[in-house]
A protein has these predicted regions:
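Basic, Lys/Arg-enriched alpha-helical interface segments
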Residues: 1-63, 71-78, 86-96
Length: 96
């Protein structure tokens, strides 16, 4: 899959250093694998859910959330948000 954009992962990891390794691990797995359909994602990442039009990944032992729009037919993963669990729970990301 082609991940757009890795820059968001790097910026988030700069602010939250403990997120760096789990985010990079996520990036490597996703960028080197073709996932289709959603059930393939669930097999690779047990903690992934569909929330509306977005796919939400639990990252770093449930400390962080990565929210992406995935276009399986185009092999594209668009990172929309990377949040702490507390930021995710506030739900403001749904408004954007």
């Amino acid at each position: 899959m082609h991940v757009i954009t890795k820059k968001r992962l790097i910026e988030f990891a700069a602010e939250y250093p403990t997120a760096r390794d789990p985010l990079l691990k996520w990036y490597v797995v996703v960028s080197k694998t073709d996932f289709a359909p959603f059930s393939a994602l669930r097999s690779a990442f047990g903690s992934v859910d569909q929330v509306g039009k977005f796919t939400v990944f639990d990252i770093g032992g449930n400390k962080y959330r990565l929210i992406a729009a995935i276009h399986f037919n185009r092999r594209r993963v668009y990172i929309r948000h990377v949040l702490t669990h507390a930021e995710y729970d506030k739900g403001k990301w749904k408004e954007k």
